[in-house]
Amino acid sequence: MSRHYEVVFLVHPDQSEQVPAMIERYKSLIEGGNGTIHRLEDWGRRQLAYPIQNLVKAHYVLLNIEVDQAVLSELVESFRFNDAVLRHLVVKRDGPDTEQSLIMKSKDEKGDKHERSERRRRDDEEGDVPAATDTDGDNAEAA
């Protein structure tokens, strides 16, 4: 019987370039066992709340999956035997979570704010240029 789980695992920051391959390996393990991945989010490198193995940052990955117990056990075992995985947490859920997590939403908002501020800065620069090149003084009278 399949159940829903939320899985978060932390990868050593020196192994960040290996994360896509690790995700593919875990995806194939889940899908090979007739499981379903409802949500997969790569949160990237983030600050740890406390040092783990003298590290202050780690690469975070979130999975919301629907698998049976045998596949989940195999997944957890693969986390345990992978030295690059610093920590993992598996939480049983009542149903599938498919909407974007709060961390990804806040990342998107930060990206939007950055884009807006960048656009505003460019608009300000463009607004300054025509005023400086206007020589007939029409803008001075209109203002």
From Swiss-Prot:
This is Small ribosomal subunit protein bS6. It comes from Xanthomonas oryzae pv. oryzae (strain KACC10331 / KXO85). GO terms for molecular function: small ribosomal subunit rRNA binding; structural constituent of ribosome. One of its GO terms (biological process) is translation. GO terms for cellular component: cytosolic small ribosomal subunit. Residues 97-143 are annotated as: Disordered. The gene is rpsF. Belongs to the bacterial ribosomal protein bS6 family. The keyword Calcium does not apply. Binds together with bS18 to 16S ribosomal RNA.
